[in-house]
Amino acid sequence: MAVHDFNSQRVFVEAGLAAGGRIDATREQANYLLNVLRLRGGDRILVFNGRDGEWLCTLETSGKRDLALVPAEQTREQTPPGAIRYLFAPLKRARLDYMVQKAVEMGVGRLSPVMTRHTVAERVNLDRMRANAIEAAEQCGILSLPEIDEPLALEKALAAWDAQVPLILCDEAAEVANPVAALERRLGPPDAGAPPREVGLLVGPEGGWSEGEMAAFDAAGCRRVRLGPRVLRTETAGLAAVAALQARWGDY
């Protein structure tokens, strides 16, 4: 059975979803559904909000622009958020868009921008990050949207980190070049017990970490992982590490 019906249109809403409810579509959603997709009253689409699962909703039109979504039946129950918290030095616009979309597709449960010594982007557009997360979830049948944190200075993020949660650091100078072997050395093999309920993944900027930051990682107990013999761009390194984590302890 497919994860979700790829033949049906799918949209995200902020409102609650329940039988007997009625959701007024935003102007943008109404324009997209009625004018771009050419749907009409009585047609059905899939709707989700990140909390109440996925619902098949009937379109109800009133006039040329007003549109309501009426939940008819739940097609899938809500899934829990992913266990990976992705901490990253912010990237410039297009590359950040790409990173967010792919991280959501791969099941990251929380996105946490951290400001480092060599961070390229000075500002982070959280609304744009959320829009990219929603678009990826809509297109890929995902039910749980990641939490998106306010940007935080790296030292504050480390100070607030729960010592019981493993924190993996992508480090091209780490001892073991095979990422899966490195992860098993740090977390144990997948058959050694239940996978971590949560794991942090820390990816740095293009300029790398400063000496002071590396010392702070050691003090915080970060577990270093090398992602093979090649130097990867920031967005590639993070996604490669997510793939390795998911393959060994994730929700595949």
Q: What is the predicted role of each segment?
A:
Residues M1-E77, D127:
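N-terminal positively charged helical leader segments and presequences
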Residues N35-D66, E155-G188:
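N-terminal-biased segments
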Residues L69, L145-D149, R224:
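Generic structural signal for residues in well-ordered beta-strands
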Residues Q74-E172:
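RNA substrate-binding interface of SAM-dependent RNA methyltransferases
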Residues L167-A216, C222-R226:
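Active-site/ligand-binding-proximal alpha/beta "capping" segment
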Residues E211-Y252:
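Structured adenosyl-cofactor binding patch, chiefly the S-adenosyl-L-methionine
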